[in-house]
Each structure stands twice: as structure tokens, then as C-alpha cells.
Amino acid sequence: MDVQKWYLRTSKLALALAIIRSKPADKSSREYTEHLAMLLSEEQSKWRSKVEILEAEVMQLRQKLLVSRLCSGSFKSGYVSSQLEAQEPKSSESTLTSMEDSGCDLSNEQRTESSDLSQHFVESCTPTHFPPLPLVKRPCAILQNPLSSHMQFLQYLLELKNLTESGNLKRDLTHFEKDSSTVSDSVFQLLDGLITFYRNPKLPFSRFWTEAVGTLASLISDYNLSSHILKKCSKKLEEFEKTLLHAILGNNHINQFQVQHYVSQSLVTLGNCSLLRKSIISLLLSEVNGFADDLGAINQEQASYDVSRYENIFYLFWVLEQLLQKETEEGNTSSIGHDDQEIKKFLQKHDETIFQLSDAFPLFTFYLWRVGILLSSAQIETLRK
């Protein structure tokens, strides 16, 4: 017998004997074992919570240290610090959406709950002046809004970047490799929180989430910061893009059009970053191509189809149009990548799909035609260049 297996069996036997000998008289061995397991699980949960609190404090200390180094190393004149302190905090307060699209009115109880929720976000999401970065001293502060400190730090970093014209920020981030990892770690944790929220987005929709997506897009759009962020967070960004896509397609609730609007707008905001736009366009076209194939099979067999998915696909068309128009406006049509497999498949089957589905699904084929025009125009513009 293997030595490791022998030790494992011996340990299990010793543990079983210890439980049998120490169990109370009014409990069976199984009941006592389950009781001990529950106590151990509770203890592990407590330690896990303590570790999370300590990790959050360490992260905030790292953020504060990075900002202090940047300010002391690059802005000794005090100009930037005074400028930042003179600025009002960025608006991350919660703005509750009205329910005009739902056709429903809010009861007094719901209005009270909405008011309480609004007050909660105003207190927990509005970034304070930076520095100093407040340390988390209570577990409830983390549980209420674990993302607010990351938002505050990243927004402050963008303010530093915007006020710096000499390029000192780039030199500092290159010099302090460990400090640059602080930015990546903050982005990673912010993405984790965003993914958790967008997996099941609900009204009222706080402005905090849309601002968080905008902050991410701005950070990744920055040439000096993007390399550090993408190096660690590329997989997490892909997961976030897919989460937004699934949040749109998987929404089958009645009168939840505002959720669709906000999630779609978040996807557009993320796609405004040129470094992410190509992957988002490819992801959207992949879904459109797959849905067109499904509709083709349904049309031939005269079978039923998922009405919710059919309605939701038009939000993807809207996002696609916004991103393709943005690409054309910026003159970056060559970056769309017509060698992309999903773009190739879309253009190759475009006319045939419209011809086959135009009678049964006229609205779908109309939007298919619109996206095809935008892609073809971008392709012609690329060939001209």
C-alpha cells in the first residue's frame, strides 16, 4: 500500500475513534460529526471574512501609496494637488430610473424603498476627495459597497493623468512595476464586482454601475495604462463582455426594457474603447450569425421559436450599429478586421440569409441589412486607404 494512502486511512480511523469516544450521550456519532463539521464551517467562514477585510485594507494602502508617490514624485509644485482638491467629486450618486416603460406605477412602499436605496448609494458610492484614501475599519463597510474604493482610486488616477501634460505619470508607472500592479489589481476587483452585478441586473439601476464601466473604458483607452491592465485582466474583460451579452439575451422578464437599455448602453460604453471594440463586434456578430442559422432552421421546419430571444437580438443590432458608426467616425475601419471569421461568415451569408428569411422575419432581415451596409462600407473604406 502507498505510504500516503496508509497515513490517510490511519488519520481517518483515528478521527472516527476520537469522535466516537468524545460524543455526548444524547447524540449519535453521525449527529455529533455533522455538528462538528458545522462548527468548523462557521469558523472557516469567520476567518475568510477577516481575510477579505484585511486584503481590502492592504489594497487601499497600496492605492494610497501609489497616489502619494505619484504626487510627491511628479507634482512637487503642488499644482495638481490643489487642482484636484478644488474640483468637486465626480458624480457617482445613484439616480433611480422611473418606470415609464413598464406601464406600472410605484406604490408608496416601493417609493420609500427606492428613496432608501438612493440614500444608500449616495452615502456609499460617492467618491470622497483623494487623498486621503479612507481605510475600511468595519466589515459592514466592505459588504455595503466593496467597489467604491476602487472606483475612487481609479477615477483619481484618471484625474492625475488628465492634469499631467509632461508625461511624468508614464515614467512613474514604468518605474514602479509593483505600483502599476496596484492599478491592475483594482481593475480586476472592479471587474469582479461588475460581473456579479450584471449577471442579474435589476431596477432601480444605479448610475454607479454605468460610471464604473465608463471608468474602465477610459483606463483601457489610455496608452500608458492599458498594457498593465490588459496583461492581467484580458480574460476577465472577455468574461465581462460575455456577461453583458448574456444579460441582454437572457432577459425574459415582462416590462424590463429599461434594464435592456442600460445594459446595452454599458456595452456601447465599453466598445467606445478602440482596444476592446474589435472583440466586442466579433462577439456580437457571432451571436447574430448563430441566431440567423437558428431562424433558418426554424423557417424550414415551420417550428416555434423563443420570442424573448428574438426581441432581445435587436438590442445587439443597436449596439453593433453604434460601434460600427463609431469606428467609421474615428477612421479606424481597418481595425475592424475583415479577416475575422465572424465578419467573414456574416458578409458571405448576408444576401442569402436576407432572401430566405425576409418573408417570415422581415424586421430581423431589415436590421441584418443595415448592419451589412455598415460593414460593407467599412470594407470599401479600408480598400480605398
From Swiss-Prot:
Region feature Disordered, mapped onto this chain: 86-110
Q: Where in the cell is it found?
A: Chromosome
Gene Ontology CC: chromosome; lateral element
Q: Locate the compositionally biased regions of type Polar residues.
A: 92-107
Question: Matching InterPro entries, A to Z?
Answer: MEI4 (IPR025888)
For this UniProt record, the keywords arranged alphabetically read as follows:
Chromosome, DNA recombination, Meiosis
Q: Which domain of life is it from?
A: Eukaryota
Say yes or no: keyword Nucleotide-binding present.
no
- Residue ranges annotated as coiled coil are none
GO BP annotations listed: DNA recombination; homologous chromosome pairing at meiosis; meiotic DNA double-strand break formation; oogenesis; spermatogenesis
Q: Where is this region: Interaction with REC114?
A: 1-126
Oligomeric state and interaction partners are given as: Part of the MCD recombinosome complex, at least composed of IHO1, REC114 and MEI4. Forms a complex with REC114; the interaction is required for MEI4 stability. Interacts (via N-terminal domain) with REC114 (via C-terminal domain). Interacts with IHO1.
Role summary:
Required for DNA double-strand breaks (DSBs) formation in unsynapsed regions during meiotic recombination. Probably acts by forming a complex with IHO1 and REC114, which activates DSBs formation in unsynapsed regions, an essential step to ensure completion of synapsis.
Family per record: Belongs to the MEI4L family.
Its recorded name reads Meiosis-specific protein MEI4
Q: What is the lineage of its organism?
A: Eukaryota, Metazoa, Chordata, Craniata, Vertebrata
Q: Which gene encodes it?
A: MEI4
